[in-house]
Structures are given as C-alpha cells and as structure tokens.
C-alpha cells in the first residue's frame, strides 16, 4: 500500500511464507508431474461412508450450524473408539471436542494453553503448522531433533530432558511421526510421561496416523499411561484413516478442564465446521476393525514398493514404521541440498517431493533429506519409481 512503511504481516508470522505444500503442488500442476509431495490419497475412502455423508445432506442433518462441541453422534463414536481401541474412557459430553481437522485442534490447543513467553518442546522435524501455531500463541518453540539411527529416526531422551526449563509449558508430540515415520515406543513414551509428571508439564499429542503403523510397530497413546490422562490433549482425525482429507473432521479428547480450555479458543476460530460430514465420520469410526487392518496392509505394501524403488534409484531410504511417508537421503545421489533437489526434480524426473528441511529449525539437520508420500494408487507409485530410476541416467 502506498505510503505505508510498517509491515502488514505481524512479526509473529513474519518467518512464515507460503507453505512448501502449496509451492510444490503448484509445481506439480505446472509441470504435469506425479505429486508425491503433499500427503493426500488419490482415491476416496469407503463407499458406505460417502453414502452416509450424502444421506446426511439429503436429510438436512448438519446443513445448518451443528453444536459447537460437535454433533452428539460423532462425539459418542469418538469416545467409543478410544475405549474400544485403547481402554481410554471419555465422557462424550465433557471430554470430546470436534474440530475442523487436526490442524485446527493443534491451533486451538496451543492458543488455549500457551501464554506469551511459554516454551513448547517439539520433536523436529515437525509438521509445519506446529511452528506457526506456537508463534501465534506467543510461545517459544524448543526443538528436540530426531536423528538417523539404524535405518530410522531416533529420539534422544537426554536431549529431551535437557530441553525442559522452568519456562516450559508443554511437550508437543507426534506419533506416528510425520515426516520421519518413527513410531515412539512404549518405553520412550513412558520416559516422556515421567518427565511430564516430574516437571508438571502438559502434553499435546498429534496422533492422526494412529492406525497407520506397520510390521511389529505398536501405537501407544501417551494418555493411556499412568498419570497422563489428566495432563494430555490427544488429537485425532478422520482424514488420514478414512481417506477423506477434504472433509476436515478432527477432534480432541481430554479431561473436562482441558477440553473446556481448548473449546474456548476453538469457538473463535471456525466455531463449527463440516456438519453433514460429522455424521458420516461417526459411522466410519464404527466400521469393523477389519477396515483399518486392510488399510494398514495395503499401505504397508505401497510403502515397500516405493521404498524398494527409491533404493533402486540410488536414494538412501529410511523405511517408516508408520504414517504414509518415506524419508530419503539424497547424498548417495551426489546431492546435498533438498530444496534445490526438489525444485529441480519435476523437470529432471517428472516427480514432486518435499524437502524435509522445511520441517526443521536447524535447517542444516534436514538439508539432505527428502520426503515422498506413498498414499497413492499402485500404478501411480510404479510410474513414479520408473521415472526416478532415470535420475542416475540423466
């Protein structure tokens, strides 16, 4: 604007530009490349759940503002899911809150629980909205880096303990972990739980990939560990489990006090969202366990296809224990800069990926790592692998 010298964007958000996902998806569209960057499936979820959404629309359920905490049918289904899967009992009226996807749940939790100047310990690399939401809350993020070890990315518990200070308010967890695919073990989570109780910390845990774990990995909600239910906000989502990312239906489960606090922030964000889809997700959560087992087996096969193809193309591959992302090391290809590599990859191979460095405060830690998504059709993954194998011949 003419004559204005003060920056329009406030200083809390000044470090955040357009997300890398928007940039790389636009690059995929412009070049006609296969988009293995952003984590969304290229097929829809179960037909019966789509039909449930259609019925809700036609019957006028959710077409007007739904209740602020979410429709009772969905809150009840979420509580039933937590009890059936993990033995966690939540009151659907006081301890469950429906949100506009997990991203709003993260934002509302941090805005509600973090005071300006509070420190938030987060595992890096991290989903990019974590940093922005901490900044919007006026908090200070304190990253603890997951580092490559024995083919995976490992948490150093001593480093985590050292990161906690008198100013620490909460630990922000993500397991299964995006982008590395690490699934925190029961022993690791027990150590984190002991630290949280010893230092009187809250835990906000993003568990949207809870059903996407492979081989012998086990997803353990930290809220299920002794002494943790009363200090944990657990975040879940329908998008990843049921392949309806556009519906934006997420939720939190927590004590009445924590749920009320998060709702106080959430009501001034979207207030409500996704009315008809809430009824459909309630039905999805009641699908037989055979659905999630089938999804897990399907994704594990896709993980193996992409991982083996990337290894054959010359990448160093960190095979994930969970999520639907593979992190690769580009140094065996003679590359060291993930940003430059990913920006050139569409022209070189017709494939789009994400540079992991965007998920780090310590950018140098993530510089040689690149993330690929395998939540695509098998034929798409095979074509991507065939294209990537040409890299060594270009």
Where are these regions (language model features)?
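Conserved glycine-rich beta-strand-loop-beta hairpin in the small C-terminal domain of fold type I
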Residues: 282, 298-307, 317-330
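N-terminal small-domain helix-loop-helix segment of the aminotransferase-like
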Residues: 5, 10-101, 108, 284-287, ...
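Generic structural signal for small/hydrophobic residues in well-ordered secondary structure
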Residues: 24, 28, 36, 53, ...
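Active-site phosphate-binding strand-loop segment of PLP-dependent enzymes
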Residues: 142, 146-215
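Conserved core segment of the aminotransferase class I/II
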Residues: 225, 229-300, 307-309, 313, ...
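Conserved PLP-anchoring active-site segment centered on the Schiff-base-forming lysine
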Residues: 112-134
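Helix C-cap/helix->beta junction micro-motif
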Residues: 31, 137, 198-199, 313, ...
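PLP-dependent enzyme catalytic core of the Aspartate aminotransferase-like
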Residues: 161-162, 344-353, 358-394
């Amino acid at each position: 604007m003419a004559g204005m010298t003060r920056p329009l964007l406030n200083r809390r958000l000044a470090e955040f530009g357009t997300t890398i996902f928007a940039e790389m998806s636009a690059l995929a569209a412009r070049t006609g490349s296969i988009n293995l960057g952003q984590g969304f499936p290229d097929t829809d979820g179960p037909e019966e759940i789509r039909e449930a959404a259609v019925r809700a629309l036609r019957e006028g359920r959710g077409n007007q503002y739904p209740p602020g905490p979410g429709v009772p049918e969905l809150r009840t289904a979420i509580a039933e899911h937590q009890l059936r899967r993990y033995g966690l009992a939540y009151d659907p009226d006081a301890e469950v809150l429906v949100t506009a996807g997990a991203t709003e749940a993260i934002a509302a939790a941090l805005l509600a629980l973090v005071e300006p100047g509070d420190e938030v310990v987060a595992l890096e690399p991290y989903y990019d909205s974590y940093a922005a939401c901490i900044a919007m809350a006026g908090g200070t993020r304190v990253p603890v880096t997951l580092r490559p070890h024995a083919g995976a990315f490992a948490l150093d518990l001593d480093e985590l303990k050292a990161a906690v200070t008198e100013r620490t308010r909460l630990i922000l967890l993500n397991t299964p972990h995006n982008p590395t695919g690490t699934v925190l073990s029961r022993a690791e989570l027990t150590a984190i739980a002991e630290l949280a109780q010893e230092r009187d910390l809250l835990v906000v845990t993003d568990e949207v990939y809870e059903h996407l774990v492979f081989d012998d990995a086990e997803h353990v909600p930290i809220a299920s560990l002794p002494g943790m239910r009363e200090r944990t906000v657990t975040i879940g989502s329908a998008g990843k489990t049921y392949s309806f990312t556009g519906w934006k239906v997420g939720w939190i489960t927590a004590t009445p006090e924590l749920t009320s606090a998060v709702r106080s922030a959430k009501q001034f964000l979207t207030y409500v969202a996704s009315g008809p889809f809430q009824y459909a997700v309630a039905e999805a959560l009641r699908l037989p366990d055979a659905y999630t087992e089938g999804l897990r087996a399907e994704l594990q096969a896709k993980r193996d296809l992409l991982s083996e193809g990337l290894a054959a193309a010359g990448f160093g591959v960190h095979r994930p224990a969970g999520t639907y992302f593979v992190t690769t090391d580009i140094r065996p290809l003679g590359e060291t800069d993930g940003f430059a590599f990913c920006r050139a990859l569409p022209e070189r191979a017709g494939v789009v990926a994400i540079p992991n460095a965007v998920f780090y405060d310590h950018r140098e830690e993530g510089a040689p790592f690149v993330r690929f998504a395998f939540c695509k059709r098998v034929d798409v993954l095979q074509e991507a692998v065939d294209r990537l194998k040409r890299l060594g011949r270009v």
